[in-house]
From Swiss-Prot:
Catalytic activity: 3-phosphoshikimate + phosphoenolpyruvate = 5-O-(1-carboxyvinyl)-3-phosphoshikimate + phosphate
GO cellular component term of the entry, any: cytoplasm
Endpoints of the signal sequence: none
Associated pathway: Metabolic intermediate biosynthesis; chorismate biosynthesis; chorismate from D-erythrose 4-phosphate and phosphoenolpyruvate: step 6/7
Name of the protein this chain belongs to: 3-phosphoshikimate 1-carboxyvinyltransferase
Active-site residue numbers: 320
Organism: Xanthomonas oryzae pv. oryzae (strain KACC10331 / KXO85)
Matches recorded under Gene3D superfamilies: Enolpyruvate transferase domain (3.65.10.10)
Subunit structure: Monomer.
Residues holding 3-phosphoshikimate: 26-27, 31, 172, 174, 320, 347
Protein keywords: Amino-acid biosynthesis, Aromatic amino acid biosynthesis, Cytoplasm, Transferase
């Protein structure tokens, strides 16, 4: 069955085996469509993630006057309109659940000659946006939010933007990317300096599209007025999606899987460092580069894990992988301590609270703190888990079920389709004990 169902029943399956093709990277897919739309000429995108979030972004650019063809589910052909070619939309632009889409579009639309409104689903409508609208306002943009800084975003066009040297108070690739996109339209130079280095997808891809951009870990700089050249992009497999199979193969005895052509952006792979610190057996094979992004096959074998103190320096490089890491920690001997991860409280759900509560429901001892948790390794029992509509929480507890003494029911799993359509089918084929069902 597809992931667009209401609940899963997860229980022990078999050892995980096989060579698995993980869907395309969500962050790269968003940016590939955006930058191809702004380019001069026609770009072909292969490996595009056919998820709800990325479809929302593609649909928005169609409303902005960009012709996008879909020869197959994982392919898009984008007829770029150039940096000045976007057209005024009719009605609001619906980002769905995509925080990446909304924040990057805020930077792009702030520089257009027309007004626009960005809306999202119930989850996205609760997420903080002032971290983006603040620096854009410093550049001369006018964007209104709700009183509490949440969407919808009302973007007033026709503003003359000027470059700024922005020192970001938060380590956020989305904030950085929004400012850089606005900087393409701004007079002068725009730079972003971060408290910790974040993922550099935008910088790498802008360079692939011909933009002269200087970047290094923690900083980026470009000048306004540049044009983008159409180019073909091969989207790597999504590391955050691969993370669930990396953890599952690491904790289910006798497992060995190969995950093909996974994106290994150095600002994305903190989970690999954390798991290796815990004793995981993960090797990289067949290194290559796709669209400026490093990729490799990952071979993961079962290995007994031990608890560890997760270095805070790794946190920005694994912020989306913590739900999976928490499950790995339950299978480890001893305690695993996470600190410096308060950002998890403002994701699609409060992921610290959701994981701590869910694991306690299954009999695991978890001591929650404002910016992290201590997870005590031990056995996983049975229980009913509320995913709070968060795709990563749902998939994390599907893994937990593979070590359950009984079964784990995971409610509200439809949002898995935002990032990993077909997760349950791929998991079942690899050996997961996982049933998908409609809730009564």
């Amino acid at each position: 069955m597809s992931s667009n169902t209401h609940h899963w029943i997860a229980r022990r399956g078999t050892a995980l085996q096989g060579s698995l093709a993980i869907p395309g990277d969500k962050s790269v897919s968003h940016r590939a469509v955006m930058f191809a739309a702004l380019a001069d000429g026609v770009s072909q995108i292969d490996g595009f993630l056919e998820g709800e979030d990325t479809r929302s972004t593609a649909a928005i650019f169609a409303k902005l006057g960009v012709r996008i063809e879909t020869p197959s589910a994982s392919q898009r052909i984008v007829h770029g309109v150039g940096v000045d070619g976007l057209q005024p939309p009719t009605g609001a632009l619906d980002c769905g659940n995509a925080g990446t889409g909304m924040r990057l579009l805020a930077g792009l639309l702030a520089a257009q000659r027309f007004d626009s409104v960005l809306v999202g689903d119930e989850s996205l409508s609760k997420r903080p946006m002032r971290r983006v609208t603040g620096p854009l306002a410093q550049m001369g943009a006018r964007i209104d939010t709700q009183d509490d800084g949440t969407p919808p975003l009302r973007v007033h066009g026709g503003q003359a933007l000027h470059g700024i040297d922005f020192v970001s108070p938060v380590a956020s690739a989305q904030v950085k990317s929004a400012v850089l996109l606005a900087g393409l339209y701004a007079q002068g130079e725009t730079s972003v300096t971060e408290p910790h280095p974040t993922r550099d997808y935008s910088e790498r891809m802008l360079s692939a599209f011909g933009v002269d951009i200087d970047f290094s870990p923690g900083s980026a700089r470009l000048r306004g007025g540049q044009r983008l050249r159409a180019t073909d992009i091969a989207v790597p497999a999504d590391f955050s999606s691969a993370a669930f199979f990396i953890v599952a193969a690491s904790i289910v005895p006798d497992s060995e899987v190969v995950l093909r052509a996974v994106g290994l952006n150095p600002r994305r792979t903190g989970l690999l460092a954390a798991l290796r610190l815990m004793g995981a057996d993960i090797s990289e094979e067949n290194h290559a580069e796709h669209g400026g992004e490093p990729v490799a096959d990952l071979r993961v074998r079962y290995a007994p894990l031990r608890g560890a103190q997760i270095p805070e320096a790794l946190v920005p490089d694994m912020i989306d992988e913590f739900p999976a890491l928490f499950v790995a920690a339950t299978a480890a001997s001893g305690q695993t301590v996470v600190t410096g991860a308060a950002e998890l409280r403002v994701k699609e759900s409060d992921r610290l609270a959701a994981m701590a509560t869910g694991l306690r429901t299954l009999g695991v001892q978890v001591d929650e703190t404002p910016d992290g948790a201590t997870i005590h390794g031990g056995s996983i029992g049975s229980g009913v888990i509320e995913s709070h509509g968060d795709h990563r929480i749902a998939m994390a507890f599907a893994i937990a079920g593979q070590l359950s003494s009984g079964s784990v029911r995971v409610n509200d799993v439809a949002n898995v389709a935002t990032s990993f359509p077909g997760f349950d089918t791929l998991a079942q084929g690899a050996g997961f004990g996982l049933e998908a069902a409609e809730s009564g």
